[in-house]
Amino acid sequence: MQVRRRLAALPLSTALTLTAHAQPAPTIADEAAAARANALRNQQVQQQHDAEQREATVQAPAVRSTVPTDGAYPTLRDEQPCFRVDTFALDVPATLPDAIRENGASTLPLDRFAFAREWLDHYRGQCIGREGVAILAKGIQQAVLSRGYVTTRVLVPEQDIAGGTLSFALVPGVIRDVRFADPVTWASWRSAFPTRPGDVLNLRDLEQGIEQMKRPSSQDADMKIEPTGAPGESDVIVSLKRAKPWTLVASVDNSGSRATGKLQGNLSLGLDNPLGLNDVLSLGANQDLYFADEGLGSHGFNGSYSVPWGYWTGSLFGYTSTYYQQIAGVNQTFVSSGNAQTAGVKLARVLRRSQSDVLGAYLQLSKRFGASFIDDTEIEIQRRNNTIIEAGLTDRHYIGGAQIDGTLAYRQGIGGLGATPDPNPPTPRPTTRPTYRYRMAVLDFNLSAPFAVASQPFRYVTTLHGQYSPDTLFYVDDLTIGSRYTVRGFDGEQMLAGERGFYWRNEVQAPLGQSRQSLYAGVDYGRVFGPSTAFLAGTQLVGAVIGLRGGIASKYGGLSYEFFAGTPLYKPSAMSTSRVTLGFQVMAQL
């Protein structure tokens, strides 16, 4: 078995001494070249992973039910006779069962119908007649429906309002039962729905449940609400359609680098409902396709598992990357290699749902490991054992046919869970040396909006990603631009990097009839800032891209593809990149 040796990191002013070898030892310049290769490879892997996560967020299933919106307060006209009303009452009739009456009680610590009582208080002190009472009853019912309480009713009991009090009867709509349309369905609605029998029926809770049941790609769900014989009670009937519970996807693309293999093959297996909890398990592997070339190569593995519980979703994830390449050193050509592993856990929760908005939050904890080698000799300064915590807010908003997805997060490297200290010695000014214990703010924004020109449909898609850190970072944590995942039009062999920066991608898509194909054209811009940029010839990139996306479906599976060509529009003169970058991805799914 071959034993790897460690190469200690010394100051640049110190000579590097190694035990005797049959061939010349790597120099400090060789070590620096290997470090750059390792950092570049790690950035490429991280860019691809982040792009896939953002795409998954944008493409996540959404369930939206249409209910009347709560309009402005209606105006009461002058009428005779009318009576001044100083007090409004919104109470549950005493004739209803105790369980239903408790759900509408105004004495609850969190009165779910407090908004309705506040709505009525807007009319306190006004003179109200028969027509005014009808207007208020309709308006308060509209307000209740707009909040998702679609089976809750507001009625006007017989009364005399001459005493200055106007009473309304609130009949809370509750869930008697949740069941599947097919009684033999093997599935769990409890892991998906945040509500239970006996709870007040709110359409937003039901939307969340159906959305969670749609997470497995092989599963589609729908629901209907059926009234029962009892006042205020309804049954929720869930219809479930399923295809095969597994998905096998194979793809080929040219997203790699020349040093470790441009052509990359990917194979992934998805398992839906392995535990019957609307959970999803995904396993994958990737490998360069230059099997006969022993001088370069890369491969990796990835996996994830997620399970919902009402408004909560828990996830486990991990991915690895290994590469090797030949680098021409000062005295010899040597093999530079490296590996990286990332694993983490994420807990997300929906905080609020409405007809046009879903607000959420998440907390993520991850571990990151890595090492770099020259001819099987480890470069200790490149060894990583980091712990990173991240907390963020997410939001999905709809404006007409447009969809907006956004994330604002805070990320920080911490010292727990065995994380090793920074490899650099302390200095009087810690911000002048790179650190893995950084503080960082991250922003993601995506807008997808349809429009038409002369009856030809188009879609405009814009994506903005940015990060800000007051610290000096190692290259693996820098924002880099100049690849198919950031600013398109560049081949990704050289990229600009900085502690702070952003890139803005813009794309117009034109579907080709009903062929499931679309042409697209885009212009992207990116810029980096920070201490690291002092050594760059420039900090801005502009690139353009045109391409074709499409797919072919069959009863056995499907084939999807993308072909594109990009070119730089602006770059630093010293930056080397292809005049035209051609890219493709072909994916087959069973």
Feature locations, PLM:
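Transmembrane beta-barrel strands of outer-membrane/channel proteins
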Residues: 225, 250-254, 267, 281-287, ...
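Periplasmic polypeptide-binding modules associated with outer-membrane biogenesis and secretion
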Residues: 23-256, 262, 268, 285-299, ...
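C-terminal transmembrane beta-barrel domains of outer membrane proteins
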Residues: 23, 120, 426-590
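Outer-membrane beta-barrel architecture
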Residues: 211, 237, 268-270, 302-304, ...
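Transmembrane beta-strand segments of outer-membrane beta-barrel domains in Gram-negative
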Residues: 308, 313-473, 531
